[in-house]
UniProtKB/Swiss-Prot annotation:
The keyword Iron applies. This is Quinolinate synthase. Coiled coil: none annotated. It comes from Mycobacterium sp. (strain KMS). The gene is nadA. Its main location: cytoplasm.
């Protein structure tokens, strides 16, 4: 811990309560710093509520690029703040705690991707946006969970595809496209991978009238489709959706109850979008400890001291930006990750 960290910790403590006074001070400091506050859907409810914008990582990064403010405070994990910096190279991008990593993004490095590419010369590399800037720089086309199928389908059928890093999203894309020349990296989000098929089946049986919203990063996504295919659960009530897709579906749903298979922070936005629906987590322990490192105290420290700043070197950012722009040219990324 640096002297600055020690000073900030002594001033704010690590157990700052998200009171109305705290929220007012956060907004005052943001105005003073000329900053816009962005919060990912998986953040603590108090962080979501105080933010100027809440959403998935790519949508927030695009908002950051269009925002009039010169400083962006990204309440999310590190690769998300990197993506904001890639799309807003002239802006100051801050993350309240630079230690907030991501098990999925960390499951492949740029060196590992280069070695993989060498095994399949001529292959097209498709990387999920949940990757580091260095991996994006080695990527041909990025994708989100909502447009991954369209991105892969846009690639000529005779070209090999290397899909990374999420094995469950990759399996979903391969299943939908029917593509046989598609290699999939064996990475995973530890939170989504932990939402298993047995839990999903038990919840579905216990709530036979509910709809199922399942994120494609989940280890249980295949189980959800199996339940529908076997008639154990009505197919029209099983939806494989990105976080943005979940919000759209919630606003249109006529169900009285929805079972949600993703990180539990998403429930806050779903309940705000459709307060008349009873949203329940398939696994109420599916909480990302990295996301929850962005605490009320960390946000106060960030706004007070201007820490932690995120930087991406010019060449890495240029190459990474190219892969993101190619994705956008293929089609709107829609509901994001």
């Amino acid at each position: 811990m640096t002297l600055l960290d020690e000073t900030a910790s002594a001033q704010f403590g690590d157990d700052v309560a998200p009171t109305e006074e705290w929220a007012a001070e956060v907004r005052r400091l943001a105005r003073q710093r000329g900053a816009t506050l962005l919060a990912h859907n998986y953040q603590l409810p108090a962080i979501q509520d105080v933010a100027d914008h809440v959403g998935d990582s790519l949508a927030l990064s695009r908002i950051a690029a269009e925002a009039p403010e010169d400083t962006i405070v990204f309440c999310g994990v590190h690769f998300m703040a990197e993506t904001a910096k890639i799309l807003s190279p002239d802006k100051t991008v801050l993350i309240p705690d630079a230690r907030a990593g991501c098990s999925l993004a960390d499951s492949i490095t740029a060196d590992q991707l280069r070695e993989w590419k060498a095994e399949y010369p001529g292959a097209v590399v498709v990387s999920y946006v949940n990757t580091t800037a260095a991996v994006k720089a080695e990527t041909d086309i990025c994708c989100t969970s909502s447009n991954a199928v369209d991105v892969v389908a846009s690639i000529p059928a005779d070209r090999e595809v290397l899909f990374c890093p999420d094995q469950f999203l990759g399996a979903h894309v391969r299943r939908v496209t029917g593509r046989t020349n598609m290699q999939i990296w064996a990475g995973e989000c530890h939170v989504h991978a932990g939402i298993n098929g047995d839990e999903l089946a038990d919840q579905a049986r216990a709530h036979p009238d509910a709809e199922l919203f399942v994120h494609p990063e989940c280890g249980c996504a295949t189980s959800a489709l199996y339940l529908a295919g076997e008639g154990a659960f009505p197919a029209d009530r099983v939806k494989i959706l990105s976080t943005g897709g979940m919000l759209d579906a919630a606003r249109e749903s006529r169900a009285s109850q929805v079972l949600v298979a993703t990180e539990v922070g998403m429930l806050h936005q779903l309940r705000r979008a459709a307060p008349e629906i009873d949203f329940q987590a398939v696994n109420d322990r599916a909480s990302c400890r990295y996301m929850k490192m962005i605490t009320p105290a960390a946000l106060l420290r960030c706004l007070t001291y201007g820490t932690d700043e995120v930087d991406v070197d010019h060449e890495t950012a240029r190459l990474a930006r190219r892969s993101v722009q190619r994705m956008i040219e293929i089609g709107q990324p829609g509901g994001g990750e």
